[in-house]
Amino acid sequence: MIRVAINGFGRIGRNFARCWLGRENSNIELVAVNDTSDPRTNAHLLKYDSMLGKLKNVDITADDNSITVNGKTIKCVSDRNPENLPWKEWEIDLIIESTGVFTSKEGALKHVNAGAKKVLITAPGKNEDGTFVIGVNHHDYDHNVHHIISNASCTTNCLAPIAKVLNDKFGIIKGSMTTTHSYTGDQRLLDASHRDLRRARAAAINIVPTSTGAAKAVALVIPELKGKLNGVALRVPTPNVSMVDFVVQVEKRTITEEVNQALKDASEGPLKGILDYSELQLVSSDYQGTDASSIVDASLTLVMGNDLVKVMAWYDNEWGYSQRVLDLAELVAEKWV
């Protein structure tokens, strides 16, 4: 059992906490939360969620310094500088770094300077010791080497399992990805200044093209795809659940049925629970609360000229991603000596 603290109790921080509360036989103990908001507000937002609904069968209370969940006290602190946090005093082993601010190794090491032993960044990292996508390269995690780690992005977690299947089975020559992505907290509700002029526009009434490093980041977990993938994002007026549109040129000639069979076999075998496969005629809201990283929509798979393959897949960019953060934290806990 390792002692864990969450830094940043926003969408991913709270989703992670809910995932942990629902996980039986967890090897981690949630000990503390650092957030700029006060414990009572955070307790309220944990219990009542516009996407997930009310947290049922859980008793949540709060005071000035803590949140209590079913009798278990989670200490709360509020400091924007990680080096000031009481991680040494509270004997914290692992930080779930979900502020979106301290994503570089230099930034994450501030938690280590404060006494934590390891940091798991819930975003693409910079100069981190390793990036891991569960189901793709998690077996490469080395407890003695990887201290500042990244769980990549929600989109990379959706894309990488599909890329792995297609590359292993057919060989990827090159490809591109478009993610139709729900709006996030990094956009403006109404037109207002932003470093990205498109993200400056009202999120709930616009389709907002923007950049994403998700496709390039696949090479961090599947090195043979380095330089072969790129992509863009379209932020759309939905609050959650996104969709990847992945187009690749492959070495081995194939047909639609063969591509779908390869994806289905993976979903029932080595990638079970990570990659799902659906032939149902569903829409985005149907996938709210889905645990899998990626759900292939088989009816949308296309093959042109036997070598151009298009696969589309849904993902819950909050809940599904947070489940993988918890999975990676559990992996770290299992390797702890």
UniProtKB/Swiss-Prot annotation:
Catalysed reactions, semicolon-separated: D-glyceraldehyde 3-phosphate + phosphate + NADP(+) = (2R)-3-phospho-glyceroyl phosphate + NADPH + H(+); D-glyceraldehyde 3-phosphate + phosphate + NAD(+) = (2R)-3-phospho-glyceroyl phosphate + NADH + H(+)
EC nos: 1.2.1.59
Top-level taxonomic group: Bacteria
PROSITE patterns per record: GAPDH
GO CC term (a single one): cytoplasm
Family: Belongs to the glyceraldehyde-3-phosphate dehydrogenase family.
Subunit structure: Homotetramer.
Role description: Gap2 has a major role in carbon fixation as a component of the Calvin cycle. Catalyzes the oxidative phosphorylation of glyceraldehyde 3-phosphate (G3P) to 1,3-bisphosphoglycerate (BPG) using the cofactor NAD. The first reaction step involves the formation of a hemiacetal intermediate between G3P and a cysteine residue, and this hemiacetal intermediate is then oxidized to a thioester, with concomitant reduction of NAD to NADH. The reduced NADH is then exchanged with the second NAD, and the thioester is attacked by a nucleophilic inorganic phosphate to produce BPG.
Protein name (database record): Glyceraldehyde-3-phosphate dehydrogenase 2
Natural source organism: Trichormus variabilis (strain ATCC 29413 / PCC 7937) (Anabaena variabilis)
GN (gene name): gap2
